[in-house]
Amino acid sequence: MPSIPSIEFSLLEKGDAETVNFLQNYLNDVGFFVIKNHPLPKSTINDVFDYSKELFDLALEHKLKYKVPNCNGAVGYTPYGIETAMNETVADQKEFWHQGSNSNPDLLPNVYPDEMNDPYKIDDLFLQFEDIAKSVLACFKSFNINYNADLSDIANNGNSTLRLIHYPQTESNNEHRARAHSDVNLITLLVGGNESGLEAQNRNGEWVDCSCNENEIICNVGDMLEIVSNGQLKSTIHRVVSKGNSDRSRYSIPFFLHPRPEVILDPRTNLTADDFLTQRLKDINLK
């Protein structure tokens, strides 16, 4: 199975012609790449993985205290078997926790579980992920994207989300922990899962392995960025499968960079980020 390319974070920050050419070549094929030597401390990642495991080990009645009503899963806990990929009838085999931005008072406030020690530690990871994602977005400005706003600005005070995911042991007749889907947002960053299984589909319809080591971050383009770039940057279908490890839980920590809700993604139709997200939440059974 083919794999995805990798690039140094320092080159993304530099954003020179060679880096842009490298990214354009690969993003047109698979839309995923690995970021090496990023500034996110390994200790921070390990702390949040440990926190995530402790959180999902809580009894269900405790976790359900943090299922926020009428928020469409924007913050807090979402139970196993709720989110369903577009055009699918079988729900993904996962439960998750959403942490949003604290910088925009117009967004829903985060919730913090009383049962956990230092529940605010994930706010620190959120901010560090956000900085890295904005650096990637700034690099994409060099793609000569025809967009009527500053690409670097649209995510400031945006509706971004840090997601802690737990994929329990899978059912023997269902190898898909997360069925094939694309991400709704601008850019997704993902620290490597504790088990393999993430695959992306290239332009030839082949599934490409998207594993990386624990010191690297996987980055992919989301649907909103494809719209903003008028198709220059391609959002990619991907999935999570159980590769012979269905008897073990899998934990994952993706960060989804979103624009502000009022940002217009497509000036031809005046489609806003909020409109697009609202429709997607309906499509995946979260609204």
Residue ranges and their predicted role:
Residues 1-287:
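Peripheral, non-catalytic segments flanking oxidoreductase cores
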